[in-house]
Structure formats: C-alpha cells, structure tokens
Regions:
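Single conserved hydrophobic/aromatic residue that forms the stacking wall/gate
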Residues: 1-5, 9, 13
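Regulatory nucleotide-sensing modules
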Residues: 14-55
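Cyclic-nucleotide recognition modules
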Residues: 22, 73-131, 135
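Cyclic nucleotide-binding regulatory domains
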Residues: 38-100
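Polybasic "coupling" helices that flank or enter modular domains
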Residues: 99, 117-187
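Phosphate-/nucleic-acid-contacting segments
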Residues: 162-228
C-alpha cells in the first residue's frame, strides 16, 4: 500500500500501523483485476471487504427512479472505499464499478475492525475519511440541486480535472468518459449533457474529440461552476 503524492500519503493506512499489523495486512491482502465497466460490488450486497484502488478508476453510483443512474463519487488511486456500510452494519446502499481496467486490493473488514479496536491512529484515519466524504456529499447535494445545467456540467469537468489531472499536454482530461457517465455525474439527461458540452465548445472553453475532452479555459469553467 505505497503512495506517491502528499494526498496519497495522507490516505495510506500503512504509516499508522506497527510492524505486526503490517505483516497481518500483507498476509491478508488480495489483489483483483477488473475489466472496464465490471461491477466491483452491488447495492444490497453485504459488505465484507475494505477496498483499495491501486490502479485505474472506479465510480460509486446508485440506481434512481426510471432507470436513471447517479454517480455519487469517483475513486482515485490509493483511495479506500466500501467500508461505510460495514461500520453502519447494513448492506451496501450503492454500487461500485470500474471506469476502465483497474487493479483493486481487498482486506477483510473483520481484520480491519480488529485492528481499529486496538489502534487509535487507525481509528482516527477512518473517522477522518468518513468525515471528509460526508462533507463532500453535503457539498455535492447543494451543487446538484441548486446549480443550473451549465453550472453542474462545469462542476463535473472541474471535479474530473481535480481528481485525475491532465495528460502530458496539460489540457486533456486524464479520463475518457461516455456522455452517459458525464450526464450521470452531473445529474442531467444525456441529451442535455451533449448540448451543454457543445455550448462549451462554441464558447471555446473546451474541445471534444470522441471521449477526449480538452479544457481550454479553466478559469472560466470554474467561474461557471461557482456561480451555477
């Protein structure tokens, strides 16, 4: 469970463990490979594992009314997910799937719980992560319910930029999303997402080539996102 950036170091549990705990994790850690769009876990299943994304991209989503899907959160490398339901003693209330071919590690939550009971530093790590996620969820609810379509799509593009960054050209988002996924992230129909993207292209805020999106005017996108 190595990390490279400052944020990744903050998210890594390794630094909060003693040598015996590290050995227990190494012995129990299992690596899984997921294909593009493959389900990792489904809403209603019982939570058994702590999931850690090692490589690739993962989305957490929930099926809504009329077959609509809402993407709740994007997972990036060296980020843990899927543990809230276990702590709440309830089934998963959302699903997770791979955006692209991804490598994910698992630890039994029974092991994690045992270590938390004996290690306050590890307990505080999960308290911190749950608190951050709750704050992010509150912000997302406000954004999705109060912003207009342009503001919601601009917000989605900024989230993708902040989560995954750019390719080497410093313009192309390092994630290639279907229009449907972009719409599900922005709480709008696919047709509205396509029209709004076209509007951003006309305003020279972005360029679009298939699923490749290049951000040409990030300050203006952030302004649109901020003021909705």
């Amino acid at each position: 469970l190595h990390s490279t950036s400052r944020r990744q170091r903050q998210m890594c549990i390794r630094d909060r463990l003693d040598n015996d705990e590290k050995r227990r994790i190494i012995d129990a850690f299992v690596i899984h490979n997921f294909k593009k769009n493959q389900m990792i876990y489904a809403e209603g299943e019982e939570p058994e594992y702590l999931w850690c994304l090692l490589q690739g991209k993962v989305k957490k989503f929930k099926d809504g009314v009329g077959g609509r899907v809402q993407i709740l959160r994007l997972i990036r490398s060296v980020q843990y997910f899927g543990y809230r339901a276990y702590f709440a003693k309830e089934p998963y209330n959302s699903s997770a799937a791979a955006f692209e071919p991804s490598i994910v590690g698992t630890l039994p939550m029974t092991l994690v719980e045992d270590m938390i009971n004996k290690n306050p530093k590890l307990a505080w790590f999960f308290i911190h992560e749950l608190s951050r996620n709750l704050g992010g969820s509150d912000t997302k609810i406000v954004n999705l319910t109060q912003k207009h379509i342009r503001g919601r799509l601009a917000e989605a593009l900024i989230v993708l930029r902040d989560h995954y960054g750019f390719e080497d050209d410093n313009m192309t988002l390092r994630i290639y999303m279907a229009r449907e996924d972009l719409a599900n992230l922005s709480n709008m129909t696919t047709s509205n997402a396509i029209r709004t993207l076209s509007g951003f292209v006309s305003e020279r805020l972005i360029t679009v080539d298939g699923r490749r999106i290049c951000i040409l005017n990030e300050p203006m996108l952030r302004k649109i996102s901020k003021f909705g």
